[in-house]
Amino acid sequence: MVDSSKAPLPFRDSALSFKREYAESLDAQDPLREFRNQFIIPSKADLKRKSLAVAEGESPSSDCIYLCGNSLGLQPKNARMYIDRFLQTWATKAVLGHFTKLEDSPFPPYMDYDDVTSKLMAQVVGALPSEVAVMSTLTGNLHLLMASFYRPTKEKYKIILEGKAFPSDHYAVESQIRHHGFDPKDAMVLIEPKDLKEPVLPTERILKTIDEHASSTALILLPGIQYYSGQYLDIPTITAHAHSKGLLIGWDCAHAAGNVELKLHDWDVDFAAWCTYKYVNSGPGSMGALFVHEKHGQVNLENKEDPYRHRLTGWWGGDKSLRFLMDNNFVPRPGAAGFQLSNPSVLDMTAVLSSLDIFDKATMPALRKKSLELTAYLEHLLLNSPEGVRPSDDPFSIITPSDPEARGAQLSVLLKPGLLDSVFSHLVDNGVILDERKPDVIRVAPAPLYNTFTDVWDFVQIFFDACRKAAQEKDTTS
């Protein structure tokens, strides 16, 4: 049994915490409870139906239990209205929509959309508005940032990253190294976990790796939250240590943005990139965003030799007042905006804006507080439920750090070998949506904007039942 004394209140020491009524009481006290109503929760019938249209005579069904915000966030109810307003503007104003502020529209002219979204996004990641740009996609932004921050020499050419990085990050780093004429076998320094059963990377190991390779390293790229284990890395400590060795460091915040309370500016992070379709709830494949610390985004035209940091350039990154002069003399906008390339998709940014407006009202500190309580409650029920409720043979373990400050919303649950397919199928059949990572892991991520303590309680009961049935099936077939 796990010591639950370290779990946040209010379920620390009450036997009532294992009752559904207790979860309902927590929901009734939740100051963020109304935000769930701002999202569309698919029903169980929606998920099983093979068409968009509701079949004639179909009976209403309850909401599914959606614990997959770490993979794709749910649709804000205002997204349709926002997009309809954009389509109406495009239809009635055409090209004039770039410059016309409409009296009955909540949106800026197209020309200023990126400034509005960047200001709101900056609040989500703890940045100055000038340090954030909503643009492109995550891997595209990583390439753009590495084109600026990875400047290898014969002596300093290595990139330090985790050995189990998300594949797209690994590919991006590998291709950047090859692009500069180096061999990834030598130039990629991979920080490996002990194994997939113990995937957490101790901060000490990361710092030691930096020390060992500092003299030959050009860049460090790490995840804010590791996608598989759910570990929240110690960004300020690692960043400060990298800087003490004279190294630049960037962070992939795909699983951190909208999940934990980041302070990218205060932590002196050099650069970061993230997507917006997970916890930021902007739709499948939606736009990415990037952060460039203000110290790297300065523009000083009086310095003729080095007026601004080298980067790949495009016209949308140029000074707005000069953009339409078409004189082919690039003068970047200060800050992250100067890293933009092309006119961003206003349609896509409208979807991002529909979610950021909700974050603006909820605020990241309040969301993080609830998230800590939700995930601790999930952990508490999984590990401390009474005998007779919890499966007797302990068919799973949690590989995410037990320290609440070292994780976000996600708990990664490692099942005993051979159980995953059956457990996952049972969960889906009972209206639970989460994701799996072969061969044996399910990732459970209660999102504080729309998930409830009752969602967590219901999931745990269904999961326990799924584990028992999977074990029985395995015994029958073995």
Curated annotation (Swiss-Prot):
Swiss-Prot/TrEMBL keywords: Cytoplasm, Hydrolase, Pyridine nucleotide biosynthesis, Pyridoxal phosphate
Cellular component terms per the entry's GO annotation: cytoplasm
Protein name per the record: Kynureninase
Listed InterPro entries: Kynureninase, PyrdxlP-dep_Trfase, PyrdxlP-dep_Trfase_major, PyrdxlP-dep_Trfase_small
EC number annotated for this UniProt entry: 3.7.1.3
Leader sequence residues: none
Protein location: Cytoplasm
Co-factor(s): pyridoxal 5'-phosphate
Catalytic activity: L-kynurenine + H2O = anthranilate + L-alanine + H(+); 3-hydroxy-L-kynurenine + H2O = 3-hydroxyanthranilate + L-alanine + H(+)
A GO term, aspect molecular function: kynureninase activity
Record's function text: Catalyzes the cleavage of L-kynurenine (L-Kyn) and L-3-hydroxykynurenine (L-3OHKyn) into anthranilic acid (AA) and 3-hydroxyanthranilic acid (3-OHAA), respectively.
Family from the record: Belongs to the kynureninase family.
Binding annotation for pyridoxal 5'-phosphate: 138-139, 166-169, 252, 255, 277, 315, 343
Modified residues (N6-(pyridoxal phosphate)lysine): 278
Protein species of origin: Coccidioides immitis (strain RS)
